[in-house]
Amino acid sequence: MKFMKIGSKLDSFKTDGNNVRYVENELASDISVDVEGSRFCLHKFPLLSKCACLQKLLSSTDKNNIDDIDISGIPGGPTAFETCAKFCYGMTVTLSAYNVVATRCAAEYLGMHETVEKGNLIYKIDVFLSSSLFRSWKDSIIVLQTTKPFLPLSEDLKLVSLCIDAIATKACVDVSHVEWSYTYNKKKLAEENNGADSIKARDVPHDWWVEDLCELEIDYYKRVIMNIKTKCILGGEVIGEALKAYGYRRLSGFNKGVMEQGDLVKHKTIIETLVWLLPAEKNSVSCGFLLKLLKAVTMVNSGEVVKEQLVRRIGQQLEEASMAELLIKSHQGSETLYDVDLVQKIVMEFMRRDKNSEIEVQDDEDGFEVQEVRKLPGILSEASKLMVAKVIDSYLTEIAKDPNLPASKFIDVAESVTSIPRPAHDALYRAIDMFLKEHPGITKGEKKRMCKLMDCRKLSVEACMHAVQNDRLPLRVVVQVLFFEQVRAAASSGSSTPDLPRGMGRELRSCGTYGSSRSVPTVMEDEWEAVATEEEMRALKSEIAALKLQEESGRKSMDRAGVTAISKIRSLIMSKKIFGKKVQLQSKGGGEKNNGGGGGGSDSSESLGSMNAAEETAKTATPSRNLTRRVSVS
């Protein structure tokens, strides 16, 4: 740190212990100056020769023969006035970055200009600032920090602007010319670990200045960053790194995505300023930092404009995000645990970039302007879209654990990435299964719409094994999973595809998703939507073993396993159809009979018996038809 000594006489200021300061001198004091409760007993001649303010005040008090002057409004208080008084007496005064602003403002208040006396205090301080302090990196930052208590006078004296300009100029210097000390704690360089103290002995990073600027208050920090952007062409990554460092330093808990209790107004100002200072270049800041800013914006209840700006920026690089970073807590008073709507906006912004269009203005033959909208190819790579789909699938699994999350919000987020072709739907299946597990009371329509999102053909063998044994899924989905696993096993061994009953097979082959059966009659829809009973689930579970045996056995054994599996599926569907028809007949004409001797339990037992009979009939009838059909094809 640089300093300057002014004067040559010894310091002869004394105190009597009662806030009274005096100069030890043979001459008695002839003027008393009061400064905020402290009294200075001094002499007129040295003070009046350099201070125009005291001359004016003393001339007005002499008329009443009063030699007491009150200057409690002087900047810097008693300490700054004492420094100015010592300069008037010629005593040694030491100025540094810590007290130069207070002394400069006090000298301005006292009117210690060159017009009063050549070589006055103001002139000497200005020379010290321009020739020494403003040429030092850390001293300039300290001087700028000390101007805060003396606003607006320090601003009027251009001390603030001069400091900001000096700091920005230093930050824009080529790194090869950086020869001063700075704070940089990101990583220890090899030269530092070996004990090398010379700055020239190591490479200077481009963001060498970012940590030192974190000492500034947000209003000064904003002005310095803006000045840096104006003075030199720095990469957006450097500015982004500076904003990131400031956020981590100034916002408690920001690195962990939380906001500790404190001055919310101050935190809000910092967050909104950081968002405003974000570089325009894409990828100048990481997606993780942007999401932390968005979480902080939500916590301090910033305006929608700030949120929308962050949503647009995050949507441009969503492929960099992780699932944990997308878990944005809802504001207080919200029913849901996470702000799902905000994440959906981000996903929609990401997908919007893949649907760009361009308006081209042309002149026709008559001279009129004609606008033509041309669709341009998307700018998103397949890898980026797959990464986003993977993250959203994991995000869906996590938010599905919230018991208060409506099914509509879960489905809306999942549907926002349905246009992305994914090689596997295992993660989506896990998310749907988690939601069904945590929300057993959802409606049949919601369950249908949710299962429609999943393509059974893209489930792995492990996922298929789990799905067939999953009693939370509708029977229709279970049958689809089993059928497509049969098809996959048949294709891998070169055997023929197993047959299904007419209508059901056509529907399954035409689509692999759950919601593609609009042409199926209503009665069939009800049968599909039904959840399998315990007996039916046990029958379906046994088919998984057959799927694995198919690959190990030959073509003949596979055909037999396929026939058996499909026959059992038929029997399950037939049993439900017979049961459904019986219930319909009873509801139309058997109301009185049901109210008579037979109760609900007797009806159920009859239905179960009918189902068993239908199963036996299907088991004996259908395999022969399937085998006959296979022979005719071969």
Curated annotation (Swiss-Prot):
Family that this chain belongs to: Belongs to the NPH3 family.
Region (Disordered) location: 492-517, 584-634
Bias (Polar residues): 619-634
Record's GO cellular component terms: cell periphery; cytosol; plasma membrane
Signal peptide boundaries: none
Pfam families: BTB, NPH3
Compositional bias segments (type: Gly residues): 588-602
Tissue: Specifically expressed in the hypophysis and the root meristems in the embryos. Highly expressed in primary root tips and radicles.
Keywords: Cell membrane, Cytoplasm, Membrane, Phosphoprotein, Ubl conjugation pathway
BTB domain ranges (all copies): 29-97
Listed InterPro entries: BTB/POZ_dom, NPH3/RPT2-like, NPH3_dom, SKP1/BTB/POZ_sf
Lineage of the organism: Eukaryota, Viridiplantae, Streptophyta, Embryophyta, Tracheophyta
Subcellular location: Cell membrane; Cytoplasm, Cytosol
Protein name (database record): Phototropic-responsive NPH3 family protein NPY2
Organism: Arabidopsis thaliana (Mouse-ear cress)
Single GO BP term: protein ubiquitination
Major subcellular location class: membrane
Domain notes: The BTB/POZ domain mediates the interaction with some component of ubiquitin ligase complexes.
Pathway note: Protein modification; protein ubiquitination
Knockout consequences: Plants lacking NPY2/MEL3, NPY3/MEL2, NPY4/MEL4 and NPY5/MEL1 exhibit severe reduction in PIN proteins (e.g. PIN1 and PIN2) abundance which are less phosphorylated and lacking polar localization in the root endodermal cell layer and in shoot epidermis due to increased clathrin-dependent internalization from the plasma membrane; this leads to defective expression of auxin responsive genes, defects in cotyledons and floral organs formation, as well as impaired root gravitropic responses.
Role: May act as a substrate-specific adapter of an E3 ubiquitin-protein ligase complex (CUL3-RBX1-BTB) which mediates the ubiquitination and subsequent proteasomal degradation of target proteins. Plays an essential role in auxin-mediated organogenesis and in root gravitropic responses through the control of PIN proteins (e.g. PIN1 and PIN2) polarity in the root tip endodermal cell layer and in shoot epidermis. Recruited to the plasma membrane by PINs (e.g. PIN1 and PIN2) and, in concert with AGC kinases-mediated (e.g.
